[in-house]
Amino acid sequence: QAIEEQLSRYRDYKPREWDDGSDAARHQKYIEELPAVIEHALAGLREAMARENRILGEIELLDMLPGLALPHNTRPDYNRRGDLKTKWSSPDRRAKSGFKAAAIPKSLTGMFDMKNVFQAAGFWALNGRQPPFLVYASASNYQIFTPENCDELKDDFLADVVEEIKVQHRCTENLLQAAETKEQLLGMVAPDFKNIIWNEPPGYLAEAKRVWGLA
């Protein structure tokens, strides 16, 4: 019943209209995949937290990392230390269906999955170094990563990642201290409008380009 409720809510979603129908096509495909993704996510989460006395949902962790002026902020999905990552089919013109099935990573060494390790390192740094877990779920299967089966989630690796996070934060702090205005701050960084983070409505992009003097 819970799955049907979520499926009904997703059917009511109104796809965006400014991306040549890409969002609408994904919406239809994901209506098919959603029940299986939910089932695999539930199975993975039950297995990952089988020894827990209770299950805690998303919380905000906001605390200082040594040597920084501003706090680190992160939001673990479950029990202060775990996160769920869902994987979905992606458009592929070469496939007969028009979509390529989602692939669950076999390790966390890839560029995109390493970003999730950085996220887990933030949990670990702020929750008393509790061992993190990541659950990946798709329409076909699921995979659980823990310190027991993944070197990237072990304490020594996470400690190194936290040091990298601190370097990134320190650079951001230096920029904030050097800039007296928003315009000065934006002038210190170069935007990459091909990056997925800029997948925004045309009006939003037009304003951003205007601010950077590109329009």
PLM features: residue spans?
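Non-catalytic protein-protein interaction segments used by genome-maintenance enzymes to assemble
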Residues: 61-117
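Metal-dependent nuclease catalytic regions and adjoining charged, substrate-binding loops involved
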Residues: 112, 122-215
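Acidic/proline-rich low-complexity IDRs
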Residues: 6, 55, 60-61, 107, ...
